[in-house]
């Protein structure tokens, strides 16, 4: 009971104990502390795994065997709590880093275990060691590696964002298939190691500039979603972007319009929402950041429904201001019966989810090239409101996830460079147009630009882009 109580106390005070130990070691070892700690752990684990052989050749009595086994597995428990002493800005990142470190330990000590296991089998066959020693060695080796592996994999599965569902499922499916399981484990290690390094850097950056309040704009932000989605607390349409903006001082509200309706109907909902926010908070105006069709909804509300007096700026993200030939192609070529069937299923499903009157066909129709051409003529910009836009494009069909990987080549055929849905030539609007060019082979899709998939893309930091975007609004007095 005392041992269990000690373990509970150790876990409760783990952060403080780890930080104190790390500070003392860094004072002595300097910048090599983390590597030294890692090597020491690997050596101790290897020595512990080899302990049955070592004690046999040393002629150790039974009490020493019991003492060594107890000490080794107590050490393993402590190692599961403190695999490294490096500090991390959040609890999630610390657990993620610990799990990643333990996966590495499993690999490194596993290589040593192959040699130990091979020698044990040879020694037992040649009668160099008794069968009991060989069995003891096998049990200790198996249990130690099992503890290290499962501790590491459970930690990264529970805390990693970048693994996503795909890698988690593949990890389980290939878990018992040699050597695919080892290849998958290497991939998981690489993903979580990069995630931990990137997220730690971001957290430290936000901490260092917290007092600067980069995103504390004069007017709050209103984030307006695109078509076929709803604002949800369970899964934020804007991914990790709102949390990043709020960490830098932003005040954020959401459009809360239906998932699919005509531009006119969605705009009416937005206009009511904006007026209610202004009256309730006394903020005077809002800065709208709208994605996809949300940009058209916002333009209509500002120009036609009197929201111009409540809106300081409108920033559209990958909005099809000049329409989507892809949408027009679908409506013109798809069988009417099929379109009606999809419409019925969609409207029924989203009505159950809370939309009062979803209208799939009206939403898609208002995104067509011909409808948007007329919309642009009938919806001039309101004076006194600052308009600007952002667009991006993918590199190829493999850049995006389903269904963007299927729609990209079709949009490419009709509209050229696109994000999987919206052509780059359709996105410009207002006094300034920012193009987000992909730096690698992947590109930036319609979903990527709002962090819908919560995926870190090498070469472009979406969250930092939005921080700087909002900071520019602040610097301009909005």
Predicted segments with their positions:
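Short aromatic-enriched loop/helix-cap "lid" or pocket-rim segments at secondary-structure transitions
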Residues: 235-236, 324-330, 398-403
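Hydrophobic/aromatic beta-strand patches that form the interior of the parallel beta-sheet core
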Residues: 222, 253, 313-315, 388-390, ...
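Flexible, membrane-associating and regulatory peripheral segments of lipid-active enzymes
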Residues: 2-234
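Soluble, non-transmembrane catalytic domains of enzymes that act on hydrophobic metabolites at membranes
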Residues: 2, 6-9, 308-312, 316-317, ...
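Solvent-exposed loop/turn segments at secondary-structure junctions
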Residues: 228-229, 259-260, 293-295, 320-322, ...
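Active-site catalytic motif of lipid deacylating hydrolases and related acyltransferases
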Residues: 213-285
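C-terminal catalytic-base region of ester-bond hydrolases, centering on the histidine
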Residues: 138-142, 165-175, 179, 381-478
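Serine-dependent carboxylesterase/thioesterase catalytic core
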Residues: 37, 41-44, 51-64, 225, ...
């Amino acid at each position: 009971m005392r041992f269990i109580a000690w373990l509970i106390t150790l876990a409760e005070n783990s952060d403080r104990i780890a930080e104190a130990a790390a500070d003392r070691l860094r004072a002595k070892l300097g910048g090599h502390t983390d590597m030294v700690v890692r090597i020491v752990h690997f050596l101790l684990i290897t020595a512990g795994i080899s302990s049955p052989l070592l004690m046999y050749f040393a002629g150790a009595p039974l009490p020493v065997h019991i003492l060594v086994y107890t000490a080794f597995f107590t050490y393993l428990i402590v190692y599961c709590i403190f695999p490294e002493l490096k500090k991390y800005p959040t609890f999630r990142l610390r657990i993620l880093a610990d799990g990643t470190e333990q996966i590495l330990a499993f690999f490194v000590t596993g290589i040593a275990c192959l040699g130990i296991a091979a020698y044990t089998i040879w020694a037992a066959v040649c009668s160099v060691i008794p069968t009991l020693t060989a069995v003891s060695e096998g049990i200790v080796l198996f249990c130690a590696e099992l503890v290290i592996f499962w501790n590491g994999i459970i930690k990264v599965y529970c805390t990693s964002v970048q693994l996503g569902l795909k890698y988690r499922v593949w990890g389980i499916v290939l878990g018992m298939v040699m050597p695919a399981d080892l290849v998958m484990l290497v991939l998981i290690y690489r993903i979580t190691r990069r995630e931990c390094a990137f997220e730690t850097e971001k957290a430290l950056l936000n901490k260092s500039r917290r007092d600067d309040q980069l995103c504390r704009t004069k007017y709050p932000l209103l984030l307006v979603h695109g078509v076929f989605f709803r604002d949800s607390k369970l899964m934020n349409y804007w991914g990790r972007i709102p949390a990043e903006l709020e960490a830098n001082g932003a005040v954020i509200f959401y459009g809360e319009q239906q998932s699919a309706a005509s531009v006119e109907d969605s705009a009416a909902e937005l206009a009511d929402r904006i007026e209610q926010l202004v009256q309730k908070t006394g903020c005077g105006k809002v800065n709208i950041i709208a994605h996809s069709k949300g940009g058209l909804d916002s333009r209509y509300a500002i120009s036609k429904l009197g929201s111009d007096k409540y809106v300081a700026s409108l920033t559209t993200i990958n909005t099809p201001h000049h329409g989507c030939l892809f949408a027009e192609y679908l409506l013109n070529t798809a069988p009417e019966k099929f379109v009606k069937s999809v419409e019925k299923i969609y409207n029924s499903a989203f009505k159950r989810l809370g939309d009062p009157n979803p209208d799939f066909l009206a939403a898609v129709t208002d995104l067509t090239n011909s409808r948007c051409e007329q919309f642009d003529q009938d919806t001039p910009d309101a004076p006194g409101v600052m308009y600007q836009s952002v667009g991006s494009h993918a590199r190829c069909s493999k850049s995006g996830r389903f269904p963007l990987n299927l729609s990209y080549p079709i949009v490419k055929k009709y509209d050229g460079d696109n994000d999987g849905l919206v052509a780059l030539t359709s996105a410009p609007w207002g006094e300034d147009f920012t193009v987000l060019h992909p730096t690698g082979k992947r590109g930036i899709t319609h979903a990527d630009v709002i962090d819908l998939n919560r995926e870190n893309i090498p070469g472009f930091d979406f969250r930092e882009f939005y921080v700087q975007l909002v900071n520019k609004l602040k610097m301009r007095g909005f």
